[in-house]
Amino acid sequence: MKNPYDSKKIESYFFMFWKKNNLFKKKLNSNKDNFCIILPPPNITGDLHVGHAFQQSIIDIFIRYNYMKGNNVLLQSGIDHAGISTQSILEKKIYFYENKNRFDYGRKNFIKEIWKWKEESEKKICYQINKLGCFTDLNKIRFTMDKDSCKAVNNVFLKLYKDKLIYKKKKLMHWDVKLRTVISDLEIENREINGKLWYIKYFFSENSNKNSKLNFLEIATTRPETIFGDVAVAVNPLDARYNNLIGKYIKVPLTNRSIPIIQDDYVKMDYGSGCVKITPGHDFNDFSICKNHKLNIINILTISGKICKKPKVYDFNGNSVSDTNIKIPKELQGLSISEARNNIVYKLNRKEYITKFEYKKVVLPFGDRSGDILEPMLTNQWYIKTKKLSEVAIEAVKEKKIKFISKQYENMYFGWMENIKDWCISRQLWWGHRIPIWYDVNKNQYPGISESDVRDNFKINKEEILTQEEDVLDTWFSSAIWSFASLGWPQKSIKFDTFHPTNLIISGFDIIYFWISRMIMLTMYIIKDSFGNPQIPFKNIFITGLIRDKNGIKMSKSKGNVIDPIDIIDGISLEDLIKKRTKEISNIKLIKKIEKITKKEFPNGIQNHGADAVRLSMASISCSNRKINIDIKKIIGYKNFCNKLWNVSKFIIINLKNKKVSFEEKEINLHKIDNWILHKYNKVFKYYKYNIDNFRLDLVVNILYEFIWHQFCDWYIENSKIIFKNNIISRLNNTCYTLFFILENSLKMLHPFIPFITEEIWKNLSKMVRNERKNTTILEFFPKKYLFLKKDNSFNEIECIKNIITCIRKLKFEKKTKFNKLVDVCFINNSYEEKIIILNNIEIIKNIAFVKNVDFSRSIPKNVLKKDIKIINNIKIYIYN
């Protein structure tokens, strides 16, 4: 073994070694258990980030662990087309580089550009998965829009449509005016911003309140720009101020249109004046009131967020209504929302319709992709009825067919599923799965995989024009069937028959609603077992927290705190890191901010740490916390561990070389310190297996780190140095055997976590022993417990000696004596048994603690201060030069 440890060289060699030797393509054995994980498909939107490295490290650990146990194993990789994200990013790119938008390209050419970009992006993603060491055959990688996935998506849609679980209806939804598509409630980010509350006079219609001195009502609103969509003014039925006004009419400002005054419990008497304008086309609460009171709905906005020329009017069921009375002043038509607001406020002020305004904090929905304010909009969308599907999915978790890890996330799942709404599955995008519905000129719907399929099934001749639905499916639709679609369904597939349901899915808690719940619902509805019962998609759900930076802040490009795992693995200069973080950012202020943050955190760039250190650090933080802070210092600590493992392995291999060592356990005459370390090993092996089987990788890392560094290296290796240095013949064979046994089995336990370095060490170690050793760790049988421990007091004896040595080291530190300086030690007032233990292990104490002479005394000498004495297990110790 060469010095020093070179992670780059080792990692590049072994991934090619696994690939060349077809280790990803293990033959199936029907006598073995099956273990499968579907890799959560990363979006094709760009480079993988630390969050991906976190999940993929965890996944690969379980895959390698089960491979070494002899199970049939599959890690099915894939990539998600990420409809809205991909389209949004590519639109920004073509605008940034070409000053064009997608309409300049047209749908067909724009989609071609995305496919080109997808090919480049896929190469990068595969490279990153390889670099991390994931044990998967990337020649078999799937894509959520490949031909087989399209077949699966169409099959599922048509099955749900046939079973009347899919329908199309006009509903009020969040609309992204920038992306020009409907957005799910789960894809919004509510932000508090500074706003205003205007108090506007709404005058009574002629003869509506002629017997009263009151000629107007004061209406408080944060959205004066939507007054042309008003259909009523509402007051609380308990508000005595307005009881006599119910049923009267009032005029919409700047128009001659009259609207009724109604009463509704929703209105808060202490909000503003206690009178609220009802604008159901642009407010969700108003939409509910409209339904209850059977009012019309007016839409005053275009899909691009401009004030329209001619408002669209619908009844409370969403049917079109002709109403020529509803008009918008010409000078407002075509204005943006903010322009219209300013213009309308100006007009109202001129007419003295605004009595006052207040500054007010308002919470508004923003699109998490576009970053723009979303508008409530009445649109015609496709939905899945989820109530029936959710009931079966809830029972699967309640009956423990599916287990959440940790259990706390079950409540989150139940809370969502028990109050689930129908799922809006259509998006007004170009990139995605086109909905497999065709229309004739009369807007009749025809479901089918293709136009020819529709014509054949419904006997429609070629002269009749058929047009496919323009909308695409929500990205989460194809993701929801990924557990079975990625394994080859709907075709007959050995892969599907062998590995479905899968064993484990790994997901962040933030997509339990988006992904996990929907996978369970659709899988259990579509896939049935041989008895016709619903089949679950996976048996265990490992929920992780979200990776944040070391300060607990969410990582984002605009914050300048995103870390590419490849940069941690290979290293990157400060200059290149700044270039990478500011690429495609045109805002000068933001660029300077990112530069400042980067220089402060990484003044010398990022050093290379290697994939193994990254994997080990990711496993060490794989707990159930919702927020997981990642700090490079932690990764440095695990790189140091890899260095330690390398150096101790080198020491063992050098000292075992050319020595005739017996590897037959029955021929080994264990010394008490051999017995002690093997006892420690057995305990570690037990805890390792228990915790990895219970998904506690963080505890496994702690156990292995503590054992290898602080027990094996700090104590047993130090003792073995004495044996080799002094050539103690009687101890050589059992010491060599013990060193080999511990290193061999530690490498096996470590391999799922740090596969590259363990392979290199194994390659060197296996040259020294019997031919049945494989040339790769992963093909070896899983570690075993040591079965020939001596049943005596040797373990406790060595623990006592360890404590004594620790005391001597502490005394040296307190006296500012160098750790390797020889000192004399005095033990005071010991029992006969304690004295025997010390004398029996005097050489260990002398060599490890750097002790020259050992004395025993019945009392503390007068010249020794109490502070200079340490007491351990009733043994008093002091040192002197």
From Swiss-Prot:
Family assignment from sequence similarity: Belongs to the class-I aminoacyl-tRNA synthetase family. ValS type 1 subfamily.
Known function: Catalyzes the attachment of valine to tRNA(Val). As ValRS can inadvertently accommodate and process structurally similar amino acids such as threonine, to avoid such errors, it has a 'posttransfer' editing activity that hydrolyzes mischarged Thr-tRNA(Val) in a tRNA-dependent manner.
CDD domains tied to this protein: Anticodon_Ia_Val
Key words of the record: Aminoacyl-tRNA synthetase, ATP-binding, Cytoplasm, Ligase, Nucleotide-binding, Protein biosynthesis
Major localisation: cytoplasm
Domain commentary: ValRS has two distinct active sites: one for aminoacylation and one for editing. The misactivated threonine is translocated from the active site to the editing site.
One Pfam family this sequence matches: Anticodon_1
Membrane-spanning residues: none
Superkingdom, natural source: Bacteria
Root EC class: ligase
E.C. designation(s): 6.1.1.9
UniProt-annotated location(s): Cytoplasm
Binding site for ATP: 557
Motif placement: 'HIGH' region: 42-52
Catalysis: reaction(s): tRNA(Val) + L-valine + ATP = L-valyl-tRNA(Val) + AMP + diphosphate
Subunit description: Monomer.
Entry-linked InterPro entries: aa-tRNA-synth_I_CS (IPR001412), aa-tRNA-synth_Ia (IPR002300), Anticodon_Ia_Val (IPR033705), M/V/L/I-tRNA-synth_anticd-bd (IPR013155), Rossmann-like_a/b/a_fold (IPR014729), tRNAsynth_Ia_anticodon-bd (IPR009080), Val/Leu/Ile-tRNA-synth_edit (IPR009008), Valyl-tRNA_ligase (IPR002303)
BP GO annotations: valyl-tRNA aminoacylation
Protein name, per record: Valine--tRNA ligase
Organism, scientific name: Wigglesworthia glossinidia brevipalpis
GO molecular function, one term: aminoacyl-tRNA deacylase activity
Positions of short motif 'KMSKS' region: 554-558
PROSITE patterns on file: AA_TRNA_LIGASE_I (PS00178)
Cellular component, GO, one term: cytosol
